[in-house]
Regions:
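Alpha-helical transmembrane segments of multi-pass inner-membrane proteins
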Residues: 3, 16-24, 92-96, 100, ...
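Long extracytoplasmic/lumenal interhelical loops at the membrane interface
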Residues: 172-173, 184, 275-277, 282-348, ...
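N-terminal hydrophobic segments of proteins, predominantly signal-anchor/transmembrane helices
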Residues: 24-50, 55-126
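Membrane-interface junctions at the ends of membrane-embedded or membrane-associated helices
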Residues: 73-80, 137-147, 210-216, 419-439
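Hydrophobic transmembrane alpha-helices and their immediate junctions
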Residues: 219, 264, 346-392, 422
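Transmembrane alpha-helices of multi-pass inner-membrane enzymes
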Residues: 67-68, 260-265, 382-392, 399-451, ...
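Membrane-interface catalytic loops of GT-C/OST-like multi-pass glycosylation enzymes that act
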Residues: 51, 235-238, 333-334, 398-408
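Membrane-embedded alpha-helical segments of multi-pass membrane proteins
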Residues: 8-17, 42, 55-72, 122-130, ...
Length: 458
């Protein structure tokens, strides 16, 4: 029998959000930042706060309070210079213009109210680049960057635990759709959950390869072990492929021996993978005539229909966030390929804008890897680039780009890369004055879990 304390947890969390947000307005952003990062993938946890005043807007309250606090105390100097800003501005302007186009295309109300579903979707999409900017402004040193990563690790551990708890007692000896569960990721679905885990595996595996402090590496090994388990039994073929693509890219730069292991897995997967996972992979083609199984065949139908629609508006598309309201193929509201969706809704211009942004983000991480002279920043840079390769592939199988709980950490890590790129340019003496020596970071790795827990309960 439970203690009954669980009923007070949402209230305690809500009060912590309010207190930390008020504190952030006066320039003390650490608590608000940690709570913001911790809650990003925990969609069902955030849902429990919606009964409180502005409870559905806690993510906005947190990032806005941090942003306003930084601007009041330091102005624009709080944020590092970065070549990524023009690309983010281009994305926001294009999608907002396309949002209005979509209203005329659908014949609906103009997107000027938060109660409008399409405007709300666009606003939630734009929150993610703002989170990157907020992280880049609030995180000033390598030690603070380590704290951010440890909160990300702690939040991921909760995501993994929710999967274990939800699937406890289920028989994984053979595949069944009933085995699949999204845990706290919520409405992004099990494929969104799998994509989230894939991104985590690629990034932290890279950091494990590059960064040597034993305590930090042990923490990563434990998390990666649980994450790989979750990835396997999420039964997402797209996530499997995206993970292999990201790890293969990383292996070329820092762990070429890993390529041998990946090649062996590709060749011998029927010998080493669990039976249920093998059955899921083999389902792609089924039946005596070796035709596509129903879900894969439905995707092909969706893509063909979407491409026909794209041809009617090839330059600017039908408008941002319009496809889900058309119901052109059965009950589906998504093309199950994000690039196809972008082509349909924002046309060739939108696709070029998106792909250019994705590649520029990946290149920013790769630049940090080559320019940094310490293993920690190198690991963050290469890990982020590998993560972007994983994301590029994952979005071929559905929308893994506009859900905060799925790819919110991409933007958090982009903020770290933006700040890391500035740190890498400083003279060695300046960076030492910032307190980023290797032994200090190792000490922070030992203490960050307890500090994050204290911050979240203060």
């Amino acid at each position: 029998m439970g203690s009954g304390l669980g009923t007070y947890i949402p209230l305690a969390l809500y009060l912590a959000v309010l207190a930390s947000s008020l504190r952030a307005l006066f320039g003390k952003s650490d608590l608000a930042l940690y709570i913001l990062l911790f809650l990003i993938p925990l969609q069902t946890t955030r849902y429990r706060l919606e009964g409180f005043f502005l409870g559905s807007e806690i993510i906005d309250i947190l990032w806005l309070s941090i942003f306003v606090g930084l601007m009041l105390r330091q102005g624009t100097s709080a944020f590092p210079k970065s070549p990524i800003y023009p690309y983010l501005i281009a994305l926001s302007l294009l999608t907002y213009f396309s949002l209005w186009m979509g209203s005329f295309y659908l014949g609906t109300d103009l997107p000027i109210r938060l109660s409008d579903t399409r405007f709300s979707d666009w606003k939630n999409y734009m929150v993610m680049p703002m989170i990157a900017i907020v992280v880049a402004g609030a995180v000033r040193t390598k030690v603070e960057m380590t704290r951010v990563l440890m909160v990300v690790l702690a939040s991921t551990a909760v995501v993994n635990w929710s999967f274990f708890r939800s699937t406890n007692g289920r028989d994984f000896s053979h595949f069944s759709y009933d085995l699949r569960d999204a845990g706290v990721i919520g409405y992004a679905g099990v494929n969104g959950f799998a994509a989230f885990i894939a991104l985590i595996v690629v990034f932290f595996a890279t950091l494990l390869f590059c960064y040597k402090p034993k305590v930090f590496r042990l923490t990563l090994l434990v998390l990666l072990g649980f994450s790989v388990y979750c990835l396997l039994f999420a039964f997402s073929r797209g996530a499997y492929f995206a993970t292999l693509a990201g790890l293969s890219f990383v292996a070329v730069f820092c762990q070429k021996k890993l390529l041998i292991g990946i090649a062996a897995l590709v060749i011998c997967w029927q010998l080493v993978l669990p039976q249920a996972v093998q059955e899921r992979i083999n389902m792609t083609y089924g039946g005596s005539d070796n035709t596509l199984e129903p879900s894969a065949a439905d995707r092909v139908t969706l893509w063909e229909d979407a491409m026909n629609l794209y041809k009617t508006n090839p330059v600017l598309g039908t408008g941002y966030d319009t496809y889900q309201f058309m119901h052109r193929v059965a009950e589906y509201g998504d093309t199950h390929n994000y690039y196809v969706k972008v082509m349909v809704e924002t046309g060739t211009v939108g696709l070029i804008t998106l792909v250019t942004l994705l590649l520029r983000m990946a290149f920013l991480g790769l630049q940090l890897y080559f320019k940094a002279d310490d293993s920690f920043l190198k690991g963050i840079g290469l890990g982020f680039c590998g993560l972007m390769v994983c994301a590029l592939v994952a979005n071929c199988f559905g929308d893994r780009w506009t859900y905060l709980q799925v790819d919110g950490f991409i933007w958090v890590l982009l903020g770290c890369v933006m700040r890391g790129s500035e740190l890498a340019k400083r003279p060695e003496t300046t960076r030492e004055a910032d307190g980023i020596a290797e032994d200090e970071v190792a000490r922070m790795a030992r203490n960050s879990f307890s500090e994050a827990g204290t911050c979240l309960t203060t």
